[in-house]
């Protein structure tokens, strides 16, 4: 973001963005760089046709996540990519939540920049990630970090070729090796099979949580157009206390709060308290979900 945008530029972002996008954009506001938020429904549904009216002469790019890390809603990047193509806009997509779960075709979706993290659906260690970049955007992007690369060491200038121009300093070799092992596992197990299992568990959880009247699902109520992430809000209770009890009393790990995505919570009407987020793995079971539901029953029977 900081290597692409110049004073006077304007970008469009979704209303579900993570602070990984929003904080750089807000920092750039002091440099006369501005953004407009694409409206979404309260379940995160974003309509591509609402974008064209927001495009200005100075609009340079559309930046958005592929799927919400809060509620799992999948955004229509194929249709939005086509709009970017027609209007000659760069299209940057954050796939932190979707990489390793669903197929993404950069060319078909007209994606110029695709960022991913290794520690979620790709099952790698924390602290490793990367990006893919189109040739057109590579010519526009200014590297922000300079340093040793182990290549062209006789030059005081950074190499001008990929990937060295963007990779300064000692690489995170343990992270790279860990991610490589994870990718090998994913290839052997099969991403479609893993995704199917996760969505079956998500559907089961969405069905069973209806038995808990105190719980409100923030986001889509079914498995359509979503990933295996479910956020719950308990309007009459303290979400943090419930999450603490789930961990201490039942051994159930969740993530509670705003998930580094306050704009998403504004969209979902769960600000300022946030939600309790459940993210299902193919290693989970329906029996574990049943234990969670039983835990909720016990908590609310006191």
Predicted regions and their residues:
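Pyridoxal 5′-phosphate
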Residues: 1-302
